[in-house]
Amino acid sequence: MVKAEQFKEWLKKNTTYSDAVIGDTVSRVKRADNCLEIYHDDVYQFYLERDEHYKTFSVAVRSQIKKAVSLYQRFLDE
């Protein structure tokens, strides 16, 4: 389960992203969570990339999701 509100606050505090970009980033994390329930582990990205639903996204969307998940993992580390 994605901690959306806490993640938004973390992004506001730790990045220079606009509110729109923060909203997009949270949305991408939720899309990843819909493919494969998100969990705090280095291998999550590995398994996500092998998910059939994830593979249907365009290369650009997959790249955006990977970046968002990477940020979310950093958020969970703190």
PLM regions: where:
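N-terminal DNA-binding module of tyrosine recombinases/phage integrases
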Residues: 1-6, 74
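Non-catalytic DNA-binding core/recognition domains of DNA-processing enzymes
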Residues: 17-78
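Positively charged, polyanion-binding regions of nucleic-acid-associated proteins
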Residues: 6-16
